[in-house]
């Protein structure tokens, strides 16, 4: 089957684009007019798109008229990409290329000494590489020094875990005779108007008169009894203070808290506790790692201490008081009658605090304001707050005497 002649002629016709139809040839400059060209635009015109360097042995594609270095375009065609690197037009082989000596002559006219130009380029590249390496080295050294300083500062500021467990509710039990040597100093430092601090739990031989705990009825912070008796100073040291070690020197920074502080309201159970003199609301501030057993032990110590203080204040003539048969306000015990020395009758034995246990009181919580839930003694206050409370106000707990303490 033969192809018509008009079809063959149509296939050989070059269809012009709209731009090609409207373009006009530029007039040649025949006089001595000079046109200034910027180095940037000149470099972009003389640069090979493959090696990004000045064209060398220029080869031009026959289809799209793009220029490349001879070695660059031949290597590109050998790699299997049979297309123009600039416009992706199909290039069958090296036959689709032609040399462009006119462009080489133009380059040699602009840059007469090609070797000098290449040597200058090499010097610039070497200098840039050296400066870049020096800057990278200096920046790396500075970054390393900065990281070392930061890690060193973190090691210095890192708190020692468990360093302040002695004065919080979660602290261990001290020896029974720790407060005997400095009774007056400790009792004076633990006055109710001293600086607040979390000290709900006290050593086994002491009380719980810390200034961070307030009561609805105005809890006492120490014993104000007879100054002439020998055991009043001991009681003041063991009951009023609560510090388990030598005092910190003035100006020394206090150790950081092991956990976040938790404020809680301690109320008597409305159904299990009868109204009495020891059923006031108590406000406690302590750390989150304190447990429910710590609260129970603190409550038992606090109530036992208050009863002991009231027993001391309620005796006729006071502890070690003078003549109680003379009558008058000075003769009835309390804080005023204890200054007479040891001439009076022998002081009766006061109730001991050694038998105080965390089993004497049970702690409850009402999450929704309804039913009360008994708290396990091993739970921490932080866990209780997250599990049962979940509101942004002080934790509210209730206490009641244990019916059958074991």
UniProtKB/Swiss-Prot annotation:
Gene3D superfamilies: Phosphatidylinositol 3-kinase Catalytic Subunit, Chain A, domain 1, Zinc/RING finger domain, C3HC4 (zinc finger). Constitutes one of the E3 ubiquitin-protein ligases that mediate monoubiquitination of 'Lys-119' of histone H2A, thereby playing a central role in histone code and gene regulation. H2A 'Lys-119' ubiquitination gives a specific tag for epigenetic transcriptional repression and participates in X chromosome inactivation of female mammals. Essential component of a Polycomb group (PcG) multiprotein PRC1-like complex, a complex class required to maintain the transcriptionally repressive state of many genes, including Hox genes, throughout development. One of its GO terms (molecular function) is ubiquitin protein ligase activity. It comes from Homo sapiens (Human). Residues 246-258 have a biased composition (Pro residues). Residues 175-187 have a biased composition (Acidic residues). Keywords: Chromatin regulator, Metal-binding, Nucleus, Phosphoprotein, Repressor, Transcription, Transcription regulation, Transferase, Ubl conjugation pathway, Zinc, Zinc-finger. This is E3 ubiquitin-protein ligase RING1.
């Amino acid at each position: 089957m033969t192809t018509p002649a008009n079809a063959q002629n149509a296939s050989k016709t070059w269809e012009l684009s709209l731009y090609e139809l409207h373009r006009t040839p530029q007039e040649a400059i025949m006089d001595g007019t000079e046109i200034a060209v910027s180095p940037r635009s000149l470099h972009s015109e003389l640069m090979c798109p493959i090696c990004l360097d000045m064209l060398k042995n220029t080869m031009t594609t026959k289809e799209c008229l793009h220029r490349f270095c001879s070695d660059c375009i031949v290597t590109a065609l050998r790699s299997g990409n049979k297309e123009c690197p600039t416009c992706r037009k199909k290039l069958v082989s090296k036959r689709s290329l032609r040399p462009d000596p006119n462009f080489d002559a133009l380059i040699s006219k602009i840059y007469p000494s090609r070797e000098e130009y290449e040597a200058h380029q090499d010097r610039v590249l070497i200098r840039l590489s050296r400066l870049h390496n020096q800057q990278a080295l200096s920046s790396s050294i500075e970054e390393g020094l900065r990281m070392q300083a930061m890690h060193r500062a973190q090691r210095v500021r890192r708190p020692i875990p468990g360093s302040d467990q002695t004065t919080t509710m979660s602290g261990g039990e001290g020896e029974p005779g720790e407060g005997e040597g400095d009774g007056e100093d400790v009792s004076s430092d633990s006055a109710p108007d001293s600086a607040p601090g979390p000290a709900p739990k006290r050593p086994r031989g002491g009380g719980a008169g810390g200034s961070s705990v307030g009561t609805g009825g105005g809890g006492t912070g120490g014993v104000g009894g007879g100054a002439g008796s020998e055991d009043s100073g001991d009681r003041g040291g063991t009951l009023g203070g609560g510090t388990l070690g030598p005092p910190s020197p003035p100006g020394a920074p206090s150790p950081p808290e092991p956990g976040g502080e938790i404020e809680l309201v301690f109320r008597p159970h409305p159904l299990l506790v009868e109204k009495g003199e020891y059923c006031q609301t108590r406000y406690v501030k302590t750390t989150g790692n304190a447990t429910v057993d710590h609260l129970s032990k603190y409550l038992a110590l606090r109530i036992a201490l208050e009863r002991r203080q009231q027993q001391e204040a309620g005796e006729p003539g006071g502890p070690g008081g003078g003549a109680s048969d003379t009558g008058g306000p000075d003769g009835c015990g309390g804080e005023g009658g204890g200054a007479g020395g040891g001439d009076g009758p022998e002081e009766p034995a006061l109730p001991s605090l050694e038998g105080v246990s965390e089993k004497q009181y049970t702690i409850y919580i009402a999450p929704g304001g309804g039913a009360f839930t008994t708290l396990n003694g091993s739970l921490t206050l932080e866990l209780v707050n997250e599990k049962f409370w979940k509101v942004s106000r002080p934790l509210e707990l209730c206490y009641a005497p244990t019916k059958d303490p074991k």
